[in-house]
Amino acid sequence: LLVNEYPTVLEEMLIREPGRYFGNPSAGGLGWGMGAALGAKLASPDKEVICAIGDGAYMFGNPTATHYVSEAMKLPILFVIANNARWAAVHRSTLSTYPKGYAAERDKPPFATLEPSPRFEHVVKASGGHGERVTEPKELMPALERAMKVVREEKRQALVNVCLEVSYVK
């Protein structure tokens, strides 16, 4: 099961069965993905659950509580964070409201930057999970494989913090 709170081209996904993909609700709700992943695992304990989420949504999703519940209820979930060290939603809405405003003139828009980026992989470790930070493309697949091994074999939660290039829309 894939709980996705990150922009995705759904047509590129290889998901063919109904009920295997849960995407952004039309009503919004930044941070909903982590709680939804817990619910998906509770509803389908025999299925693997992956939560793909941006760094801003991860922070909004109350990660300490999520990882605590995952450990306490023995819900092995893989969390994959696309970490570009910014709140894209905040930046986009600010630019749409004030296209020539203060934020549009800055290299690092106020209230949209998440730099320095927290070490999210440490948050999951506080609740008995496996956490890794990926900074190079060649590290990604091995990190995902190690994380899935923890989820499948050790029945623990895992998190891969994928650090992306920081960029801002002008």
What feature does the model see in each segment?
Residues 1-3:
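Active-site pocket-lining segments that scaffold enzyme catalytic pockets across diverse folds
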